[in-house]
């Protein structure tokens, strides 16, 4: 699907729909399972036109700010899907409030705990700290990629200034896992330092870096789940947030991309004990993959029968 990426978001979405439709025509799947809220999730439109049952993981997340492109995607995907799997009870409540029938929404919980447990040996074996000459609790890991943070020149300059400010204030090394989108914006501003702005890390290395960092600064959605499950201090750099349950648990601090606010947040989260953070119960419990698998297998026939009037 990388070939679908274009210079303009609408062109990318058009390419996704065209290419997905060709794949669906070729393989004729019994169902399609969509995860998340990225542009690729809009392939639900192609699947719907072909009368293919659609299941959506991570449904019902809402930040209630339609300036965020992912918020628009979430609503389109949720309302197009036949069955929605919500991470939390609150996410289900949002969907029901929007008019989606409660019997088409299931609370699956987060798959992240299961993923982290399954890959724990590989994460433990990561030698990324040695390769980067890092000492545990003596560095920051930073990753920003969202439109609100990197698509305006002044925000990119703020990001570059933030890296220098963190290094000077805390006397720690700053490692930036640089999303391709962010790198393009940095290069356009003439801001390049390959010792700081590194290519994206693989999953095992990145989790190992997060677990051992003094603090993680990120605009990723999954930082909420990872910080709560693994117990590391984190600051999320966002103007709006779609996972309020982590805020309820006191699991992280949300601030905009302003250097002084981020530094203040880091000072707070690194001083308070992270061992006493309330667990988000919906993030825990495991066996999410089994729940999803069993539900998909169980509901394909129902969707075909009730939505598309197909008879076996």
PLM features per residue range, with description:
Residues 33-35, 41-44, 56-57, 84, ...:
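A donor-sugar binding/catalytic signature common to diverse glycosyltransferases
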Residues 23-30, 134-135, 212, 299:
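Glycine-rich phosphate-binding loop signature in dinucleotide/nucleotide-binding domains
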Residues 1-101:
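Active-site and donor-binding regions of nucleotide-sugar-utilizing enzymes
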Residues 124-213, 310:
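Donor-nucleotide binding loops and adjacent catalytic segments primarily
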Residues 271-312:
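C-terminal amphipathic helix plus adjacent low-complexity
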Residues 4, 77-155, 255:
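A nucleotide-sugar donor-handling region in carbohydrate enzymes
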């Amino acid at each position: 699907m990388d070939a679908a990426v274009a210079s303009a978001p609408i062109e990318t979405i058009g390419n996704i729909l065209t290419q997905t439709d060709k794949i669906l025509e070729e393989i004729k799947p019994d169902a399609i399972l969509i995860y998340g809220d990225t542009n690729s999730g809009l392939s639900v439109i192609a699947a719907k036109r072909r009368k293919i049952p659609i299941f959506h993981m991570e449904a019902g997340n809402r930040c209630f700010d339609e300036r965020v492109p992912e918020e628009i995607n979430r609503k389109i995907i949720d309302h197009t899907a036949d069955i929605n799997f919500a991470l939390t009870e609150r996410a289900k409540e949002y969907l029901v409030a929007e008019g989606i029938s409660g019997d088409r929404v299931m609370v699956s919980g987060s798959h992240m705990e299961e993923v982290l447990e399954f890959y724990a040996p590989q994460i433990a074996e990561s030698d990324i700290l040695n390769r980067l000459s890092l000492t545990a609790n003596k560095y920051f890991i930073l990753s920003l990629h969202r439109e609100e943070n990197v698509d305006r020149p002044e925000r990119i300059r703020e990001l570059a200034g933030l890296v220098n400010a963190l290094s000077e204030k805390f006397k720690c090394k700053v490692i930036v896992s640089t999303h391709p989108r962010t790198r393009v914006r940095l290069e356009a501003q003439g801001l390049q330092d390959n010792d700081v702005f590194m290519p994206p890390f693989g999953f095992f290395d990145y989790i190992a870096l997060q677990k051992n960092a003094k603090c993680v600064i990120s605009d990723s959605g999954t930082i909420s789940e990872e910080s709560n499950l693994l117990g590391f201090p984190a600051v999320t750099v966002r103007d709006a947030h779609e996972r309020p349950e982590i805020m309820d648990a006191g699991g992280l601090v949300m601030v905009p991309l302003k250097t002084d606010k981020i530094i203040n947040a880091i000072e707070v989260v690194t001083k308070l004990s992270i061992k006493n953070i309330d667990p988000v119960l919906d993030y825990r419990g495991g066996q999410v993959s089994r729940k999803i698998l069993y539900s998909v297998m169980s509901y394909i026939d129902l969707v075909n029968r009730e939505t598309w009037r197909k008879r076996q």
